[in-house]
């Protein structure tokens, strides 16, 4: 019988195993805060980004975003990324949206969304809005 050929396994040096990876992109959505009173209440989420990738202006950043800004960012990504399918955001919540468990579920959904989007190579290299949304306190969505 023919012997199946296996790819050659390269041994890593200790330096390679413990060296800083070539591309780091870590995104966390943390620290939700609810603001306002009554009908004017809303929740913001802190986006913490750590990277060494050249497509981002800052290696470490932290910005706050409302869900409505995530929606605008999502729409902008869909318009500029014709070849990439943009994953959906966690759904709109109309009742009891300020309960801790509801806010935590949304936080997790927003974090997963950002990690998927930011991890896509075409979006990383071609998006005009990704780094701005993740890093710029002055992010201004276009209509």
Swiss-Prot record:
GO molecular function, one term: phosphatidylinositol-3-phosphate binding
Primary location group: cytoplasm
Binding site for a 1,2-diacyl-sn-glycero-3-phospho-(1D-myo-inositol-3-phosphate): 66, 68, 92, 97, 106
InterPro entries: PX_dom, PX_dom_sf, PX_Grd19_PX, Sorting_Nexin
Pfam family, any one: PX
Gene Ontology biological process terms, A to Z: endocytic recycling; intracellular protein transport; late endosome to Golgi transport
Gene3D superfamilies named in the record: Phox-like domain
Location within or outside the cell: Cytoplasm; Golgi apparatus membrane; Prevacuolar compartment membrane
GO cellular component: cytosol; early endosome membrane; Golgi membrane; nucleus; retromer complex
Residues of the PX domain: 23-140
Bilayer topology annotation: Peripheral membrane protein
Keyword Protein transport attributed: yes
Record keywords: Cytoplasm, Golgi apparatus, Lipid-binding, Membrane, Protein transport, Transport
Record's function text: Required for retention of late Golgi membrane proteins. Component of the retrieval machinery that functions by direct interaction with the cytosolic tails of certain TGN membrane proteins during the sorting/budding process at the prevacuolar compartment. Binds phosphatidylinositol 3-phosphate (PtdIns(P3)).
PANTHER family xref list: RE52028P
UniProt similarity note: Belongs to the sorting nexin family.
Domains as described in the record: The PX domain binds phosphatidylinositol 3-phosphate which is necessary for peripheral membrane localization.
Name of the protein this chain belongs to: Sorting nexin-3
Species of provenance: Schizosaccharomyces pombe (strain 972 / ATCC 24843) (Fission yeast)
